[in-house]
Amino acid sequence: MDSIPQFLIAAPTSGSGKTTVSRGLMALFVKKGLKVQPFKCGPDYIDTKYHEAVCGRPSINLDTFMASPEHVRSLYARYSADADVAVVEGMMGMYDGYDRDRGSSAEVARLLGIPVVLVVDAKSAAYSMAPLLSGFINFRPDIRIAGVIFNRVGSPHHYRMLQEVCEDLNVTCLGYLPKQKELEQESRHLGLDFSRSKETEGLDMLAGLLEEHVDWELLLSTIGLPLP
């Protein structure tokens, strides 16, 4: 079976930047000529509209509360079959489900056997990220954290301090998004306007920032897996 890069984007909490990073990476991959198959954990119908506008393909909900594990795996394999890369956007905090972690993003990653890229809001923190990340890396050994992308980083020096966190924990630091007023405004308005212009607004800027500050080639090179 052919292997393709595939991963789930999760975060410690809601509001960390999952949707911003998901849309930006999808836009960047499309810009590079890749066929991107988007997915969304849970029943959310708003983020899927934004995914489809970016990728030109339907974004598929993966909901382990409403559907059986077999059905979720089947959906994932079917829609990813002709893609160059599969990107799953998580929901809420990584382990937040309806009963402990049941129905959570972590459950979807475990079910599909795909690695996680953790998006962490680093505003107003530096080495205090170490115990937080250590918990997510070690809490479930059957879920692999493929790398970390820091959001709302204040300066290159701030980012260097965050890189030291990843070095000490032996986890890949994939890069960061700098703190930008435009990105925070975009996040606040997502879901309030369903016009086509809003669905794609700011994507070029976002993709450009990720291309500049995230090692997307390293990411794609380390997460090639056969489809489940």
PLM region spans:
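Internal gly/pro-rich beta-alpha loop/helix module
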Residues: 127-228
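ATP-dependent carboxylate-amine ligase catalytic core
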Residues: 2-16, 20, 26-112, 120-147, ...
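Short hydrophobic alpha-helical runs that function as membrane-insertion/retention elements
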Residues: 116-119, 174-176
